[in-house]
Structures are given as C-alpha cells and as structure tokens.
Amino acid sequence: MKTDQKLNMTMLCDFYELTMGNGYLKAGFQDRITYFDVYFRSVPDGGGYAIAAGLDQLIDYIEDLHFDQQDIDYLRGRGIFCEEFLDYLANFHFSGDIYAVPEGTPVFPKEPMVVVRAPAIEAQLLETFALLTVNHQSLIATKANRIVRAAKGRAVMEFGSRRAQGSAAAIDGARAAYIAGCCGTACTISDQLYGTPALGTMAHAWVQMFDTEYDAFATYCKYYPQNAVLLVDTYNTLKSGIPNAIKAFNDILKPLGIKKCGIRLDSGDIAYLSRKARKMLDEAGWTECTITVSNSLDEYLIQDLWMQDAKIDAFGVGERLITAKSEPVFGCVYKLVAVEDKDGNIVPKIKISENVGKITTPHFKKLYRFYGRDTGKAIADYLTVYDETVDDSRNLEIFDPDATWKRKEVYHFEARELLVPIYQKGKLVYKRPGIEEIKKYCTEQVDTLWDEVKRFDNPHNYYVDLSQKLYDIKTELLNEKNERYEKN
C-alpha cells in the first residue's frame, strides 16, 4: 500500500456497484427507491439453523460511509465515470432505511436477515460490505454454536487467531464466537475492542525456556497463582508433565490455600490421557483441578471424546472454528425484491432461475416467528407482505411454499416480528446492545428451538412459510415471466 494512502472502508465494494451506480445516475434512476434482502439459501454443515451476526460492524461501516478526495481522484483516473457521478459520491451520505434481525437470532434459509430500503445507488453501494460482515460473522457464530452445544455445558474457548484468514477474520471471528456461546478468546485485541474476555496461560515455549519442567510450572504458579493452568505435554504427559504439575501445585498453591487450578492437554490420545490425568489428579488430592484440551477440535471430535468417556472440563478450539473449516462459506446473497414507482407504489420484483432454490421471494416483507404459548418453543417462521398483520388470537393455517399440499393449523401461538428498524431516513434509531446482552439473547433464542431442529445430522426441517397473499404474488410474477418468455 502506498505510504501516503489512507484506508477508507467505503471503497471496499465490488467495482460493479460503482459502474451500476454511474449507470443508474445516467439513466435517471438515482432517486428511485429500491428494496434489497440479505438472506442465505442453506445452513452450513447441513445444520438445522444458523446464528445471525455482523450487524454491529455493518452499522459501524454505514456510520462512516463517505468518499475521500483520494477516492474520487482514483475513480476519475479510471476514465469511465462521469463527473456528475463523481460529484454525487463526493457528497454521498446514506439516507435510507434498514431493518434487520438482532444479532444472536437463530435464522433459517430464504428469510431476510437484513432489509435495505434506499435510493438505488445508496442501496447498491452497501452490497459488498453487508454481505462480507454478515456472511463471515454468521458463519463463525453458527460453527461456534455447534461446538458449544457439543461441549455439553463445558467451557469452550476460541483459540484460532493464528490460523484465521487475516487479521479482521481473527478479530471479528472471535466476537462472533463469543456471541454464539464461547466463554472467551485468545485474541487480545478482540477483548480490547469488543469486550470478549481474553483468556490464555502458556505455550510450550514457556516450559522449554526453563532448565526443568518443574521449574517452569513452579515459576508460573508463583506469578499467576489464581490462574495456574499448566501445559503438561511438552515432554511426556503421564511420566513428566502431570507429576510435575502436581508437585508445583503442592509446593506453591497448597500453602496459599488455593485449590482451583488446571492442566491443559494439547496432543496425543486426548480421551485416554484425560482419563489418566483425572485419576492422577484426584489421587493426589487435586479434585478441583480442571482439565482443558485442545488440538484441532470440532463438534464431531468433541462428541467422539464423550463417547470415549473423556474427562474434560474445558475445550480450546482453534482452526476448525475460526475458519469454519468443514464448510467455510455461508452463502448470503443481496437481492433486489422491490422498487417504488413514481407515485410511491411498491412494485415487487423477482429473479427466476433454472435452479429453483435461487428463485427470489419478491416484495417488501415482514418476518414473523410463531411461538407456542404453552411451550415457548418456535413453531415456524412466516413471511408476509409489508402491509399484512398476523392476528395471533385466532388459528392460522400455514403451508409449505414448495409443497403447498403440506398444511398445518397453528393455534394458541404468539407471533413476534423479527425484523427491527436499524436506520430510518439515514438516522441510526437502533439502540445497540452490548456484547453480553447479545450473547445472553442468543442463548435464550437457541433454547426456543426444539431439540430436533438442533440435531447435528439430519435435523428437522424448520419451515419458513409464506402468507397466502405473498405466495400468490410470487406465483403471479413467475407465471407472468414464464408466459412472456414462452411467447418469444
């Protein structure tokens, strides 16, 4: 990067957003109000649900959305943008509306996570960053939540910064992991920026720096008696590491009356070593000593450890969490669903594809979630046209939009709107929750899902249904487009 060049994140956009914006202005569309939905088509890892995340960083981006003179000069140098468009960018500010599901909300395919209502150029320029931040953080939050659930109440620490795909991925990934249930992160700057608790004790290098393993452990216990978690696999876990840890605990912590301490296993047969370690620690009287394990873990390996009767109190999970290694793409898209005509009427738009899963759901919409009043559990999600309301005092028949003969009557339920206002006329109206509040909300909302939806393999298919009015509009647009092309 040029040393005199400042980084303006507004320029983190796909070039076609600028060429389209230039074209919109030339065509007279710059003031035309458009509606875009951000949604995904399938849950990573074949899961039953995803976790929404990344909204806070999208807000940060919009709050600083502007084009510097160096940006205008660069674009002018490309030689394809008219001066009127460059003037437009030089005076750019966001003036639209945004709605979104709160971070930490369980979400499902084909329902809008973010809705943008704004003039055409403004809405188009948001596309790349909206997708970047929602895709990345939702991906990591979804993976982290799977791992946390596999841990069955034991602590999960995010350890992946060094394996993340770039610094931003490490920082924001740690945030997303914390929202989804991790107890903390090894990423110090994420704690500094977001308040995700920074955790960590020692690496093998600490042990290697001392003449003996015991000296390394004893010194660490002296310096950090309230946080003595010793890495015991540098040389020989059972014959050296654990015995030396026990000796250090006896010599340093016991005289201080400290009973809480820990060891960490980072290699070898984790299940076997954890069982042996637990036995050795208990026999030595250190029953409150915790056993933390790491080493390329994910939800499936953690499940396997439980099947092998592993004795584990906490997990440090790195590369397979921070990169979502098993399926590292979330797949959110940003699609035009409506425009306003010159009289302010909302005109629904649809994109058709040979791939049925890529056909969009048109119109400016509301998203409801139905909860059973007796159980508190989520029953289904329900998309309506923006001007519809749901009367949850009456029974309602819902149907699968892809198989309309599959119908169900919902009764004794509560309907809650999921999309909340974030921006109104360019002004931030959303009260941004703190990270602890988001984390708590995420836990509460995941608890509203039935266990069948939370299965790792072959989860129950949670339905996102359409109102009859919305379904009819979509069908009418499909038929209209098909008839037009058949005539040609």
What are these regions (language model features)?
Residues 199, 263, 291, 313-315:
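Hydrophobic residues within beta-strands of alpha/beta enzymes
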Residues 60-64, 100-103, 107:
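An N-terminal, globular interaction/scaffold subdomain
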Residues 2-33, 42-44, 80-81, 86-95, ...:
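Buried, small/hydrophobic-residue-enriched core segments of structured protein domains
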Residues 34-90:
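N-terminal, Lys/Arg-enriched amphipathic/low-complexity engagement segments
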Residues 98-104, 413-418:
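Short acidic, Pro/Gly- and aromatic-enriched capping/linker segments at domain boundaries
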Residues 2-32, 36, 45-47, 282-284, ...:
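Gly/Ser/Thr/Ala-enriched C-terminal appendages of enzymes
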Residues 73-74, 142-146, 160, 454-461:
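Short coil/turn segments at secondary-structure boundaries
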Residues 204, 294, 318:
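Residue-level "edge-of-site" marker
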